[in-house]
């Protein structure tokens, strides 16, 4: 994955151990498991990031939907769940991020 490759290349002595940990845990174990299809794993991740208010990572994972099979409609549906289970303000902010991210993705095509 290009994102992982860029993150590993940008690692310094200060954060190399952290980068190795997240690469191994997230990409080497969780994302590599075949028990949940990538589309659903992507939706779970987006909902969790939105609910937790992790804006930078949310935009990153929305951009990654181009590779996971999750559509814009899928993401917006997941964010409706965020509104109910994590709160309207979190979902409102996440929807704004999603709209901006999808618009930028369309402009880049």
PLM feature segments, named:
Residues 41-49, 79:
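Short, structured motif recognition centered on aromatic/hydrophobic residues
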Residues 51-76:
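Mid-chain, well-packed structural core segment of small domains
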Residues 1-39, 67, 92-109:
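Acidic, glycine/proline-rich low-complexity segments that act as flexible tails and inter-domain linkers
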Residues 26, 48-54, 87:
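Short alpha-helix boundary/capping elements
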Residues 23, 40-42, 58, 75:
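N-terminal alpha-helical segment
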Residues 36, 40-43, 53-54:
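Helical "substrate-binding/catalytic lid" subdomain
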Residues 83-91:
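C-terminal structural segments of small proteins and small subunits
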